[in-house]
Regions:
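N-terminal catalytic cores of secreted or lumenal carbohydrate-active enzymes
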Residues: 1-41, 45, 49-64, 70
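Catalytic-core region of carbohydrate-active enzymes that cleave or remodel glycosidic bonds
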Residues: 36-39, 43-46, 65-68, 75-189
């Protein structure tokens, strides 16, 4: 199939994600089976596991303990959209992570302001500064945090699912948000 679509050689695939915001017994069962199959055929590929939906609480704690106990060689995908100062207050989140456990991929993150839906709360400068502050914590903990990606990226004006996005567009224009410039700042200078 790959060759038929114009790419004869295998891709240099380094990561494969198994799950998206999953946790619990069904995920554990399915993950174990898929992890085993991937590692038997492609031992060099790093498997990305799921931390679940939240940054804290019983489901998160249980998932992380299970991953650290059985799958330390994975990279754990964490997702979070936070409100009003959370990223400022948790800039040190990864300072206390176990260095011998699974590494982290912050696969989705964004700061969001209260009052979602107003023009003032859509991708504003306060959120961008908060995200920049948080990224300094991710960089400081580069021995644990392997990757991070802002989400979501694109939004069509009046047809979006989220009110925080890096790039807004309509049929006439494109707007790059303050959060976009934070991502560019870090991508080009860190």
């Amino acid at each position: 199939l790959r060759a038929a679509n114009g790419h004869a050689k295998p891709f240099n695939l380094q990561y494969i994600g198994l799950g998206n915001e999953n946790w619990g017994a069904v995920y554990e069962r399915n993950f174990k089976a898929l992890y085993k199959a991937v590692k038997e055929k492609y031992p060099q590929i790093t498997v990305i596991s799921s931390a679940g939906t939240y940054l804290e609480g019983d489901a998160y704690d249980g998932n992380m303990a299970w991953i650290d106990r059985e799958f330390k060689d994975t990279v754990v995908d964490e997702h979070y959209y936070t409100y009003d100062g959370y990223l400022f207050d948790h800039n040190d989140r990864y300072d206390r992570f176990d260095r011998s456990g699974a590494h982290v991929f912050v696969g989705e993150y964004a700061a969001t302001s209260a009052g979602i839906g107003t023009i003032e709360t859509k991708s504003n400068i306060w959120e961008a500064v908060e995200e920049a502050s948080y990224l300094t914590g991710l960089e400081r903990n580069g021995d644990v945090v392997d990757m991070a990606s802002y989400a979501p990226t694109f939004a069509k004006v009046n047809a979006q699912s989220w009110n925080v996005n890096l790039i807004w567009f309509d049929s006439r224009q494109t707007v790059l948000t303050p959060s976009y410039y934070v991502q560019m700042l870090f991508a080009n200078n860190v």
